[in-house]
């Protein structure tokens, strides 16, 4: 889906001696850094006009629209430039949730002296826990409490949600900050289990939260 109208003072952007400016691309919902690419004035102009990311390929010496062959288009939500006007930050909706040509979500998936490939770090703990919950759903483990909830089914999960909600209320009534934090964490966890059970992604929840930012 195309982004809303974008604007940027092109004449204020400071390009290097090659006419390029680095562009950091970030997921607009959870903040994950997806990639670093390069733009020139023309690619930036096309990005503003089309609402999708266009970059300059230094190896091929040509413009390229992200997702041209893979279909993993990036719809731009916002473009910012830094205090020196020589770097860009784009927040995007990443189609297919894959930004890297290797098939990884983020291009920043390598770590260590040997550059071994690892799972890119999630942007927040909630995402990390949700990913683990989904793994326990899809690949059950005998000794896993999370897996046992999925095995027990929806009624068990909903019962736990009700119990945890009541415990949050009681902790708040007691005005116990430490207990409140602990009980809310339990509630968040069981809510994530319910989301995973019903195949609702955190992205869908984030989108609804965006509508409530008033």
Swiss-Prot record:
One cellular component term from this protein's GO annotations in UniProt: cytoplasm
Origin: domain of life: Bacteria
One Pfam family of this chain: PRA-PH
Catalytic reactions of this protein: 1-(5-phospho-beta-D-ribosyl)-ATP + H2O = 1-(5-phospho-beta-D-ribosyl)-5'-AMP + diphosphate + H(+); 1-(5-phospho-beta-D-ribosyl)-5'-AMP + H2O = 1-(5-phospho-beta-D-ribosyl)-5-[(5-phospho-beta-D-ribosylamino)methylideneamino]imidazole-4-carboxamide
Segments for region (Phosphoribosyl-AMP cyclohydrolase): 1-125
Keyword Hydrolase listed: yes
Segments of this protein annotated with the region Phosphoribosyl-ATP pyrophosphohydrolase: 126-214
Pathway: Amino-acid biosynthesis; L-histidine biosynthesis; L-histidine from 5-phospho-alpha-D-ribose 1-diphosphate: step 2/9; Amino-acid biosynthesis; L-histidine biosynthesis; L-histidine from 5-phospho-alpha-D-ribose 1-diphosphate: step 3/9
PANTHER family in alphabetical order: HISTIDINE BIOSYNTHESIS BIFUNCTIONAL PROTEIN (PTHR42945), HISTIDINE BIOSYNTHESIS BIFUNCTIONAL PROTEIN HIS7 (PTHR42945:SF1)
Family listed: In the N-terminal section; belongs to the PRA-CH family. In the C-terminal section; belongs to the PRA-PH family.
Protein name as annotated: Histidine biosynthesis bifunctional protein HisIE
Organism: Thermosynechococcus vestitus (strain NIES-2133 / IAM M-273 / BP-1)
């Amino acid at each position: 889906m195309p982004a809303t109208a974008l604007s940027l003072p092109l004449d204020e952007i400071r390009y290097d001696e090659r006419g390029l400016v680095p562009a950091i691309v970030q997921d607009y919902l959870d903040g994950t850094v997806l990639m670093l690419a390069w733009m020139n004035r023309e690619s930036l102009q096309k990005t503003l006009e089309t609402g999708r990311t266009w970059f300059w390929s230094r190896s091929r010496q040509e413009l390229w629209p992200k997702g041209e062959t893979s279909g993993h288009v990036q719809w731009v939500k916002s473009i910012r430039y830094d205090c020196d006007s020589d770097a860009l930050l784009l927040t995007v909706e990443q189609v297919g949730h894959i930004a890297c040509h290797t098939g990884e979500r983020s291009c920043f998936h390598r770590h260590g002296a040997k550059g071994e490939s690892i799972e890119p770090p999630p942007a927040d703990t909630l995402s990390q826990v949700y990913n683990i919950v989904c793994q326990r759903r899809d690949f059950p483990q005998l000794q896993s409490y999370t897996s046992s909830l999925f095995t027990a089914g929806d009624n068990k999960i909903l019962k736990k949600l009700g119990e945890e909600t009541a415990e949050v209320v009681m902790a708040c009534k007691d005005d116990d900050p430490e207990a409140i934090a602990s009980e809310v964490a339990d509630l968040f966890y069981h809510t994530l289990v319910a989301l995973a059970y019903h195949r609702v992604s955190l992205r869908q929840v984030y989108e609804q939260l965006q509508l409530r930012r008033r």
